[in-house]
Amino acid sequence: MSNIQNMSLEDIMGERFGRYSKYIIQERALPDIRDGLKPVQRRILYSMNKDGNTFEKGYRKSAKSVGNIMGNFHPHGDSSIYDAMVRMSQDWKNREILVEMHGNNGSMDGDPPAAMRYTEARLSEIAGYLLQDIEKNTVSFAWNFDDTEKEPTVLPAAFPNLLVNGSSGISAGYATDIPPHNLSEVIDAVVYMIDHPKASLEKLMEFLPGPDFPTGGIIQGADEIKKAYETGKGRVVVRSRTEIEELKGGKQQIIVTEIPYEVNKAVLVKKIDDVRVNNKVPGIVEVRDESDRTGLRIAIELKKEADSQTILNYLLKYTDLQVNYNFNMVAIDHFTPRQVGLQKILSSYISHRKDIIIERSKFDKAKAEKRLHIVEGLIRVLSILDEIIALIRSSDNKADAKENLKVSYDFSEEQAEAIVTLQLYRLTNTDIVTLQNEENDLRDLITTLSAIIGDEATMYNVMKRELREVKKKFANPRLSELQAESQIIEIDTASLIAEEETFVSVTRGGYLKRTSPRSFNASSLEEVGKRDDDELIFVKQAKTTEHLLLFTTLGNVIYRPIHELTDLRWKDIGEHLSQTISNFATEEEILYADIVTSFDQGLYVAVTQNGFIKRFDRKELSPWRTYKSKSTKYVKLKDDKDRVVTLSPVIMEDLLLVTKNGYALRFSSQEVPIQGLKSAGVKGINLKNDDSLASAFAVTSNSFFVLTQRGSLKRMAVDDIPQTSRANRGLLVLRELKTKPHRVFLAGGVQSDTSAEQFDLFTDIPEEETNQQMLEVISKTGQTYEIALETLSLSERISNGSFISDTISDQEVLVARTR
């Protein structure tokens, strides 16, 4: 008969993953609500206790304990066992450590522990209370993985470990984050709930007001703590404990003595130092980790003029000096993961301890009754000692003597066994008194145990007494300070920025940088670092307190505070926008750059190839939340082939639009409505089907130039294009040819005075002695031509101008720009 079964892969995967999920939920990642332990932690404690590796004895090699645990109870690899053992020994992760370790057991800096062959470990004293009375049949046991011996499914837990040490873990579909608490406060809450089973959460929080982290710190948000205790979920703010320390010379330093729970100290120090290195906050001189055996200490030395409180607020907001701790109190309750609140945790623990105390009392009572039975037999023997001795002497052997005792004097099997094994020295008068005292003590003990078993009030008194004993022995002061309200950190970012002079440069391909005046002045403009196929389109002197706006050909705008730009040498290429802006496209280019002091006022005009135009307000470009990683739209393009042709600040002048086919239209800028960033604008010029916009510019002079793709150039009077309304076709400025027709490559105003500087992106740079406006043309063969536009004579409107060289017509224009 075949053992092969036909099953669908879908059914098999679902069923097997269901098994796996159930296993890791119940047997790996989540703690039991009763003892607060995960299976691996429970197995470590039980195995070490079973092997006698306890508090009152010497340390043993960790590797030996790990081997015993792995071989007997936890066959999942030595590293997982050792990691769990190490964590239970780390006093910065546990409020009460359960394992004491000799040797390197890691650090708050995230250093790994020494290998287990080098370290030694034993159970801590308080861990013994978790295992107390386990030998008295108080908890259920189950077979281990190979059915060779049994292990406990839960520990007796003489204190509420789940709340005291907390827990964290990730399972299939579940995760848990339960913070540690102060032992004394937890026990006080348990004792109160024993006396008041229906106690309100508000009353319980008078005894247990909130978590108590082993690393101290300040916990803010009483309402969130209450919410977490009520629902099992919540979030509190955990802030480092800091103080401002005065130094010589009027300087100050910020001292950190406590940091938030589970924050890596070395990483924190590195992040704070990165703030100094990147000059995100001016005024930090040095960051030092001065921690030693006496405790944690981080020193942040400040400059003399620095605002210590502002710097501290910045560090609290942007580093792990302050973090959010998220409560997610999930535990295994009756084999099921549940999100539990404080009342449920306490009631489950009380119920568990009730079972433990009753089972322990039953065990002790049975043992006492058995001993009382023996003692009663021995006392009776002493009253008829001579007869008993004679009977034993006349017996053939031990078995015969036992049988004779049972038949002749009605002793039980247990009493007969005790009599025949009785040592002769026990037959003295002193021993008779001892036996009588023992009988009285046993009867009192049995009465007490019976009361515990039969009377709930007596049992609860025992529970409270034992909890108070634990509290008395292990009580320690609260480490974390609780504050009712979460303080909102407000930072005047502008006040943090040191005002420095710098030079900002931008290339068409999207490379940008800022350069110190020293580096800039040590080089010439032509020595700027850039790729061979790229073009420098913007250089300007600016202050680090100002802002840079970059407008692209795809209708996107990118914002950068000047102080956030990478400070590089003038000869360095710079940082490409694609390194930080996730939606910067490969074919995207920078069209226009602008440095602004504020966003309060100012208008821009944008014109697209499809002939649409719009004005928009600078206020709408105020920094958005994701500016560091994403650009935002300033104009909506009509299709994928559409591009922005012109972007410039708005002035109260006419606008002149020139199409590739040679149509020019002039109208007032006031005809263009101010619209939102996501609009496409209105029709600026009426285009034929095969036409598109080549250039658009503000009319600020009496003439303008037109350059064609064949290298023909002309200058004509602005008055030849009379002002009309937008959305018209315009007038031709080229003469149409049947063969090799001219098409507009670039058009722009011809400036004859310094008023042109606001449109010249290079005007803030020291120039040559002449202020003439030059047109630079590069042909497709790499030839460069320069023409002084002001020297051109005016041409008629319908003419094609003159070629700038005899060969340019065959080469055609690749790049053209004015300067």
UniProtKB/Swiss-Prot annotation:
SMART domains: TOP4c
Site (Interaction with DNA): K38, H74, H76, R87, K93
BP GO terms, sorted: chromosome segregation; DNA topological change
Domain Topo IIA-type catalytic: 30-496
Sites annotated Transition state stabilizer: R117
Swiss-Prot/TrEMBL catalytic activity: ATP-dependent breakage, passage and rejoining of double-stranded DNA
CDD domains assigned to the protein according to its UniProt record, in alphabetical order: TOP4c
Topology class, membrane: Peripheral membrane protein
GO cellular component entries: chromosome; cytoplasm; DNA topoisomerase type II (double strand cut, ATP-hydrolyzing) complex; extrinsic component of plasma membrane
Keyword annotations from UniProtKB, A to Z: Cell membrane, DNA-binding, Isomerase, Membrane, Topoisomerase
Pfam families according to UniProt: DNA_gyraseA_C, DNA_topoisoIV
This protein's record includes keyword Chloroplast: no
Subunit-structure text: Heterotetramer composed of ParC and ParE.
Protein name (Swiss-Prot/TrEMBL): DNA topoisomerase 4 subunit A
Native source organism of the sequence: Streptococcus pyogenes serotype M1
